[in-house]
């Protein structure tokens, strides 16, 4: 039996956030935690373009984005491509959002809360049973 850290599933993250300071904070925290931030964007259109040409392991998206389309629209499109989405928002996620995202991390959150949330999502994507971290609501189960 091997002991040690399990290999991460989530390594490359796309941040989609319309608030510049929050986007910068997310970028900094993710880099500090050892994740590769593929890009930080503020709109559905830019995110969809990138999803079509980059390998992304997870999208960290606000519900409200610049432009006419929302994080919910982005989550629908990402799910069609097999890319999981974790919402990060201070708003309630509608039922439809719960059907297309892996979960939601409530704003505001600390680096530790973000780390715990991403570790929980990673374990969930690996098919493990997961207890949600503080401020995190998970929408899928390992059996889903």
What do the PLM-derived regions correspond to, one by one?
Residues 61-79:
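Conserved phosphotransfer microenvironments
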Residues 52-54, 77-83:
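Conserved phosphotransfer cores of two-component systems
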Residues 20-39:
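Two-component/phosphorelay signaling modules centered on CheY-like receiver
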Residues 17:
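Conserved acidic carboxylate
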């Amino acid at each position: 039996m091997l002991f040690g850290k399990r290999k991460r599933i989530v390594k490359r993250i796309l941040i989609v956030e319309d608030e510049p300071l929050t986007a910068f904070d997310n970028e900094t925290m993710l880099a500090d935690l050892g994740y590769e931030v593929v890009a930080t964007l503020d709109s559905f259109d830019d995110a969809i373009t990138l999803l079509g040409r980059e390998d992304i392991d997870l999208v960290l998206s606000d519900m409200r984005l610049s432009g006419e389309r929302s994080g919910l629209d982005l989550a629908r499109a990402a799910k069609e491509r097999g890319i999981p989405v974790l919402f990060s928002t201070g708003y309630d996620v509608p039922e439809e959002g719960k059907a297309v995202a892996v979960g939601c991390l409530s704003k505001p959150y600390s680096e530790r809360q973000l780390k715990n949330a991403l570790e929980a999502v990673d374990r969930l994507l690996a098919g493990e049973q997961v207890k949600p971290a503080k401020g995190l609501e998970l929408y899928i189960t390992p059996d889903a």
